UniProtKB/Swiss-Prot annotation:
PANTHER family: UPF0178 PROTEIN YAII. Belongs to the UPF0178 family. This is UPF0178 protein SAB0630c.
């Protein structure tokens, strides 16, 4: 059964995912570090799992828990590269789907930007997340959900 796992420490689309899955029967797990603890109550199909505040602790837990039927939402290219051949779909919060063709290019860009920073240089970061970005993500996730439901 399909399940959505969210890399929840910095995900701007958690509420959208919850809203879109409320009627679908798809369970959602938000994985966060304790430094991002929240008392927010979620619907019954949503669970929150907290892990220690170590570097990449959330990523390790996601890799451990994910299965071939899962959809993982993350903006972490490193985590996405570990999951792209393991899970059903890995998706960025901008709606783009990571795959074996685009992940290496994204990792290379991340590496080049790290080298620029290491040498004291600067590079342009991502633009602010907008309502339009949220709508694009929602449309992309809905397409994925409909495709999965058709296969079930």
């Amino acid at each position: 059964m399909t399940h959505i796992i969210i890399d929840g420490d910095a995900c701007p689309v958690v509420d959208s995912i919850i809203d879109l899955t409320t009627e679908t029967g798809i369970f959602v797990t938000i994985i966060r570090s304790f430094s991002h603890f929240s008392n927010q109550l979620y619907p019954p199909h949503v669970s929150t799992l907290y892990v220690d505040d170590g570097p990449d602790a959330v990523d390790y837990k996601i890799v451990q828990l994910s299965t071939k039927d899962d959809i993982v939402i993350t903006q972490d290219y490193g985590l996405a590269s570990l999951l792209v051949d393991k899970v059903l779909i890995v998706m960025h919060h901008n709606g783009k789907i990571y795959n074996s063709k685009n992940i290496q290019q994204l990792l290379d860009k991340r590496y080049m930007n790290a080298q620029i920073r290491k040498q004291g240089g600067r590079h342009k970061g991502p633009p602010p997340f907008t309502k339009q970005d949220q709508k694009v993500f929602e449309q992309s996730l809905l397409k994925v959900i409909h495709r999965i439901k058709e296969l079930d």
